[in-house]
Amino acid sequence: MSTMLLNRNTSMAPAVHRQNVQVLLEKIAEADAILVGAAAGMSASCGFNFFYQNDAIFEQYLGDFHRKYGFIGAFNGFYYRYPSPEAHWAFLARMGYMEYECPTGQPYYDLMTLLQGRNYHIMTTNQDFQFTRVVSEDKLSAIQGDSRYYQCSRRCHD
């Protein structure tokens, strides 16, 4: 299976990159345990750039917020000074909806193929639900939180 990924993902890559991938696959095969660290680049590799720019997904789900408030990318939307708490919660709710609706990116499936049958754990700063779709939560540490669990500061609702 790893050879299939190597051939599919590196057939057009320079020889040095193919060689580096081959070394990585060998190290994975030899490892007793694997700790994966993943951040924004993992989702960006799927083409999901909505946190930092107004890509097609951002425009589809949050374009009206951009037009109304002028911020670029969802990350700026988190810190925008909205005119009311309700407007801020409207953004957060729509952001959550977008993350639930966004399809799982192929690189997440590819990573799980590489890790299949191995002793591994994933640490991520990503909050976009991508990992929770492909890995059991006991093998995942979302060290900057998980936006599926938004809650107001008074914690009056689940």
Give the residues covered by each predicted segment.
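Conserved catalytic core of sirtuin-type NAD+-dependent deacylases
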Residues: M1-D158
